[in-house]
Amino acid sequence: MSDNDELQQIAHLRREYTKGGLRRRDLPADPLTLFERWLSQACEAKLADPTAMVVATVDEHAQPYQRIVLLKHYDEKGMVFYTNLGSRKAHQIENNPRVSLLFPWHTLERQVMVIGKAERLSTLEVMKYFHSRPRDSQIGAWVSKQSSRISARGILESKFLELKQKFQQGEVPLPSFWGGFRISLEQIEFWQGGEHRLHDRFLYQRENDAWKIDRLAP
């Protein structure tokens, strides 16, 4: 069998989704209630990085980009993550704040997609979280000019050791180029795998102070 033939075998990789369905009668009025339940179950199932989410943005040419970051907080105002403000994603959000998020809980045969608008967090919010991080992570935030080209990993490691020595006394200061974003909750879609590819999808859309719920075809 040639390498090409082996690659073509991916077309036959599939499985049935058998972990149960999602019914309209079981849905809460508030999508955050269901999100919290699903996130809790993802944690209880000991999934690797249950708070990992794909963040999708677009650049000024409408070219989409995606990357995985960690959810650090959520409430009725939105979902929060932190990043280097000089990063590609931060620049893209500055140009176009429309963002989508995806939580891929494959083991539970579930996905959650969020669509909303990103806004910068206040310095107070950022500082509070920054100083809750492990000290080495705080120093690491100073090291990297995110998304810039570098010639070798050793540059980062040397810079880390240099800054660790510099900041050995007292608190590590908050970098001016480090911050966070809150993604507003405009649409939230819940996907539960189903047998025979008859998956269950429910879309919550915000309408004024309430949520409209629709079942979508798989």
UniProtKB/Swiss-Prot annotation:
Cofactor: how bound: Binds 1 FMN per subunit.
InterPro entries: Pyridox_Oxase (IPR000659), Pyridox_Oxase_CS (IPR019740), Pyridox_Oxase_N (IPR011576), Pyridoxamine_oxidase_dimer_C (IPR019576), Split_barrel_FMN-bd (IPR012349)
Taxonomic source organism: Escherichia coli O139:H28 (strain E24377A / ETEC)
Residues annotated as signal peptide: none
Enzyme Commission code: 1.4.3.5
Catalysis performed (reactions): pyridoxamine 5'-phosphate + O2 + H2O = pyridoxal 5'-phosphate + H2O2 + NH4(+); pyridoxine 5'-phosphate + O2 = pyridoxal 5'-phosphate + H2O2
Residues at which substrate binds: R14, R15, E16, Y17, K72, Y129, R133, S137, R197, L198, H199
GO molecular function: FMN binding; pyridoxamine phosphate oxidase activity
Needed co-factor(s): FMN
General function of this protein: Catalyzes the oxidation of either pyridoxine 5'-phosphate (PNP) or pyridoxamine 5'-phosphate (PMP) into pyridoxal 5'-phosphate (PLP).
Top EC group: oxidoreductase
Pathway(s) the chain acts in: Cofactor metabolism; pyridoxal 5'-phosphate salvage; pyridoxal 5'-phosphate from pyridoxamine 5'-phosphate: step 1/1; Cofactor metabolism; pyridoxal 5'-phosphate salvage; pyridoxal 5'-phosphate from pyridoxine 5'-phosphate: step 1/1
Protein name as annotated: Pyridoxine/pyridoxamine 5'-phosphate oxidase
Coiled coil: none
A Pfam family annotated for this UniProt entry: PNPOx_N
PANTHER family: PYRIDOXINE-5'-PHOSPHATE OXIDASE, PYRIDOXINE-5-PHOSPHATE OXIDASE
Keyword field: Flavoprotein, FMN, Oxidoreductase, Pyridoxine biosynthesis
UniProt-annotated binding residues for FMN: 67-72, 82-83, 88-89, 111, 146-147, 191, 201
Protein family per UniProt: Belongs to the pyridoxamine 5'-phosphate oxidase family.
Subunit record text: Homodimer.
Biological processes annotated in GO: pyridoxine biosynthetic process
